[in-house]
């Protein structure tokens, strides 16, 4: 067996007289003669002070660095960007959210390649920073491990009528809708505002960040049990230290990201997301990560796996509980062990421990699902997975719906068509949207938006106005992980690419059938052909800057909205 070099890249900056200048630079940041034989580990962090999601990452990065030292490596920390969806929601800033995923992946690749670092610990806390980091790991194919910042504790509020309840960030969006509809006072709205974020950590439900953290653990890219503990929990410091040690161990064994990120690993990730009833954004992100790993994953794989995996997590936004409750009952390993025992998970997949999924779960020996937060597989919330891909005349390439929170098996109604989200929001707040309507928001796709904005503001307003079970919302944009109800997104092809959604007109009948997995525009093809005659897309919204570049490169949502 050939000897494994645990410094596969950094020798070019540490060895020989040609490395004199680079060694001199590295001496200035603390390295010395005793360090040249150590592998150099990039500690990539999306820490910032803009959002509570990332506040713990500076502390966790220090723990990871200590772990790297303990393992025999030398850590070198660097930062990347992160966008807060909670702050950027509902205005122009949301155009930049999904774009940040690509910026994060590109920036981590840039530093790792330029500085010839040997391996990396990747730390993130916000929705797009998690997949961005995992995309970078897959693209680089070095020894790598991911560590999540952890989720926030739920807030607590007492309203003016004496009602007391736990609240998350999603409650604030819905409260805005209720206030605008005259169903909540501004005083109670302020009370909710002051309660939703009591400290550090990512949004607490099974929204996008917690879905992706669970997925990272299921993929084998995070230490077992590391997804669920809250951000403020000191177990996270232990996971940080162990992650630093683990990446050095991976280097010693010659294990790289693509050894872990196999087709079976992605199937495990989909199964776990289905069981939890995770965010629709997981479809985009897993497709993108798989593409970076050169794994043949398609949008149809989600239905194939979802057919056999029950939905067992009673978690917000559609359920009762949050990630802290999952942690109290054993975390992600509980779900993985239940799926493994039922033959719904591949136990032979390699992980960052150097052991297989089955070996890790045997060591942890997690308890069975508690039956409340996490149901048993023979008593599920739904018999199939919490996400479904729809196809039909309105979405030939596909659309995504969170069936875990969808309140109708069949919905048929007349279209109310809007170009971009703002026009739809104005119509809703003016009372021009009625029960039974199908609100169609086009030109919000990856290219046409650009940036495929999340529609949490309008979905929460619909729910807050009491129309959540009576109005269907369709878009070529996407939804927040906190969205629930009659919402279907990721419609592809998008409007700017002459997808059928571009040719829907007010009054057209649209029908969705969840059991049949169909989404159809009930208009004769001859009429659609006539509408296409002389059609031209809306002009680009941005002609300079990152969004102009992005709109020229980005692919269909059905391919993960990737740019490469």
Swiss-Prot record:
Q: Note the PROSITE patterns from the entry.
A: ILVD_EDD_1, ILVD_EDD_2
Amino acids binding Mg(2+): 85, 127-128, 454
Q: Would I find Metal-binding among this entry's keywords?
A: yes
The entry marks the following residues as binding [2Fe-2S] cluster, namely 53, 126, 203
Gene3D superfamilies, sorted: IlvD/EDD C-terminal domain-like (3.50.30.80)
Its needed co-factors are: [2Fe-2S] cluster; Mg(2+)
Active-site residues are 480 (proton acceptor)
One GO biological process this protein is involved in is: L-valine biosynthetic process
- Asked if the record carries the keyword Transmembrane, the reply is no
Q: What reactions does this protein catalyze? A: (2R)-2,3-dihydroxy-3-methylbutanoate = 3-methyl-2-oxobutanoate + H2O; (2R,3R)-2,3-dihydroxy-3-methylpentanoate = (S)-3-methyl-2-oxopentanoate + H2O
Its EC number(s): 4.2.1.9
Q: Which GO terms describe its molecular function?
A: 2 iron, 2 sulfur cluster binding; dihydroxy-acid dehydratase activity; magnesium ion binding
Cofactor binding mode, per the note?
Binds 1 [2Fe-2S] cluster per subunit. This cluster acts as a Lewis acid cofactor.
User: What keywords does the record list, in alphabetical order?
Assistant: 2Fe-2S, Amino-acid biosynthesis, Branched-chain amino acid biosynthesis, Iron, Iron-sulfur, Lyase, Magnesium, Metal-binding
User: Which pathway features in its UniProt record?
Assistant: Amino-acid biosynthesis; L-isoleucine biosynthesis; L-isoleucine from 2-oxobutanoate: step 3/4; Amino-acid biosynthesis; L-valine biosynthesis; L-valine from pyruvate: step 3/4
Family to which the UniProt record says this protein belongs = Belongs to the IlvD/Edd family.
Assembly and oligomerization = Homodimer.
What the protein does?
Functions in the biosynthesis of branched-chain amino acids. Catalyzes the dehydration of (2R,3R)-2,3-dihydroxy-3-methylpentanoate (2,3-dihydroxy-3-methylvalerate) into 2-oxo-3-methylpentanoate (2-oxo-3-methylvalerate) and of (2R)-2,3-dihydroxy-3-methylbutanoate (2,3-dihydroxyisovalerate) into 2-oxo-3-methylbutanoate (2-oxoisovalerate), the penultimate precursor to L-isoleucine and L-valine, respectively.
Please give the HAMAP family that the UniProt record associates with this protein. Answer: IlvD
Q: What is this protein called?
A: Dihydroxy-acid dehydratase
């Amino acid at each position: 067996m050939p000897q494994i070099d645990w410094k596969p890249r950094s020798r070019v900056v540490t060895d020989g007289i040609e490395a004199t200048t680079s060694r001199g630079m590295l001496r200035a940041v603390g390295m010395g003669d005793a360090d040249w034989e150590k592998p150099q580990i990039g500690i990539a962090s999306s820490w910032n002070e803009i959002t509570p999601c990332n506040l713990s990452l500076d502390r966790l990065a220090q723990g990871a660095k200590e772990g790297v030292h303990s393992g025999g490596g030398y850590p070198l920390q660097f930062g990347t960007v992160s966008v807060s969806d909670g702050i950027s929601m509902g205005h122009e800033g949301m155009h930049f959210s999904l774009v940040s995923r690509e910026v994060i992946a590109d920036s981590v690749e840039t530093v790792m390649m330029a500085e010839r670092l040997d391996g990396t610990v990747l730390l993130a806390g916000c929705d797009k920073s998690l997949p961005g980091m995992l995309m970078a790991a897959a693209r680089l194919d070095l020894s790598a491990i991911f560590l999540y910042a952890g989720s926030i504790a739920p807030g607590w509020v007492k309203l003016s009528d004496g009602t007391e309840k736990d609240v998350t960030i999603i409650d604030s969006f819905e409260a805005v809708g209720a206030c605008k509809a005259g169903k909540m006072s501004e005083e109670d709205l302020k009370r909710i505002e002051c309660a939703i974020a009591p400290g550090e950590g990512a949004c607490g439900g099974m929204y996008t960040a917690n879905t992706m953290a669970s997925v990272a653990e299921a993929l084998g890219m995070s230490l077992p049990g590391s997804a669920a503990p809250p951000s403020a929990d000191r177990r996270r410091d232990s996971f940080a230290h162990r992650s630093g040690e683990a990446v050095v161990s991976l280097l010693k064994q010659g294990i790289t990201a693509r050894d872990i990120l196999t087709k079976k690993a992605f199937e495990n990730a989909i199964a776990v997301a289905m069981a939890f009833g995770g965010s629709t954004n997981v479809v985009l992100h897993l497709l993108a990560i798989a593409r970076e790993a050169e794994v043949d994953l398609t949008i149809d794989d989600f239905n194939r796996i979802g057919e056999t995996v029950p939905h067992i997590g009673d978690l917000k936004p559609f359920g009762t509980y949050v990630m802290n409750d999952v942690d109290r009952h054993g975390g992600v390993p509980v779900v993985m062990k239940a799926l493994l025992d039922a033959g719904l998970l591949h136990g032979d997949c390699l992980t960052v421990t150097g052991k297989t999924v089955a070996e890790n779960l045997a060591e942890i020996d997690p308890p069975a699902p508690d039956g409340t937060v996490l149901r048993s597989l023979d008593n599920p919330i739904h018999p199939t997975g919490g996400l479904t891909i729809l196809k039909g005349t309105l979405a030939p390439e596909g659309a995504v719906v969170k069936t875990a929170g969808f309140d109708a098996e069949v919905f048929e109604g007349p279209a109310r068509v809007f170009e971009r989200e703002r026009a739809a929001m104005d119509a809703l707040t003016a009372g021009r949207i009625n029960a039974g309507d199908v609100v169609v928001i086009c030109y919000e796709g990856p290219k046409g938006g650009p940036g495929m904005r999340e529609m949490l503001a309008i979905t929460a307003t619909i729910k807050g106005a009491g129309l959540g079970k009576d109005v269907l919302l369709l878009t070529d944009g996407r939804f927040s992980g906190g969205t629930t109800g009659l919402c279907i997104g990721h419609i592809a092809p998008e409007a700017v690419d002459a997808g059928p959604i571009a040719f829907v007109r007010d009054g057209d009948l649209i029908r969705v059938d969840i059991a049949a997995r169909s989404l159809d525009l009930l208009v004769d093809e001859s009429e659609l052909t006539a509408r296409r005659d002389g059609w031209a897309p809306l002009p680009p919204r941005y002609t300079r800057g990152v969004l102009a570049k992005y709109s020229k490169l980005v692919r269909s949502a059905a391919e993960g909205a990737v740019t490469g």
